[in-house]
A protein has these predicted regions:
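Conserved aromatic
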Residues: 9-11, 71, 128, 152
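Well-ordered, non-membrane alpha-helical segments in soluble/globular domains
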Residues: 18, 80, 85-89, 102, ...
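Acidic, proline/glycine-rich low-complexity IDRs
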Residues: 1, 132-133, 137-183
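Short beta-strand element of the conserved SAM-dependent methyltransferase core
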Residues: 6-11, 97-98, 148-149
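Low-complexity, serine/threonine/proline-enriched polar segments
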Residues: 23, 28-146
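Short, extreme N-terminal segment that most often corresponds to the first beta-strand
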Residues: 1-39, 172-183
Length: 183
């Protein structure tokens, strides 16, 4: 599956913003991947980019074209932050519907009484996964449903970028870099 995420970064220009994101998402020599929930990505929006809408093969190349700079288009930048907030609300509402607290507690009791898991159950795993993803989002952690990651503050929330937008000297240096993540 693919998900569009925006990486919020402070930079002097689009190219520098692009480069910061490319470097931060690169796998380190020790195998560490910053976006550990994703197996690969395309910086610049990938299949969600304007270029890919014209030619799907352009969706597999890193490209800085679709990066949003606050100084260049304040309205589109703000609209994107609003849209990200809607994505987050949709993800949390899905979790509310999918999460079954009684089932989760029952699974925990079974686990404790058995001294661990005696067999794999997809039903048990999905209940736990829903809980884990919702809790991760509530704590500002980055998931496939976060929609945004603030590289400057290391949190998957828009709180700090919104604060930076309130300071004119910082606002002009704010960028949202679209990234197509596969997971």
């Amino acid at each position: 599956m693919h998900t569009l995420q925006y990486i919020a970064v402070e930079a002097d220009n689009k190219q520098q913003a692009f480069d910061k994101v490319v470097v931060s998402l690169s796998t380190r020599e020790d195998g560490y991947r910053f976006a550990d929930w994703s197996d690969w990505h395309v910086v610049g929006g990938g299949r969600f980019s304007e270029k890919a809408h014209k030619n799907i093969m352009d969706g597999y190349t890193d490209d800085p074209t679709d990066i949003l700079g606050f100084a260049e288009d304040k309205d589109k930048f703000q609209e994107t932050l609003v849209q990200i907030g809607k994505w987050k609300a949709q993800a949390m509402n899905r979790a509310i519907v999918e999460f079954k607290p009684d089932k989760f507690i029952s699974d925990m009791v079974d686990y404790a009484s058995e001294g661990g898991r005696s067999e794999y159950s997809g039903d048990v795993m999905m209940s736990a996964y829903t809980m884990k993803e919702a809790a991760t989002m509530l704590m500002g952690g980055w998931t496939c449903d976060s929609g945004l990651y603030d590289l400057e503050e290391n949190i998957a929330e828009a709180t700090y970028i919104k604060e930076r937008l309130d300071k004119p000297e910082q606002a002009v240096r704010q960028y949202l870099v679209p990234v197509d993540f596969h997971f």
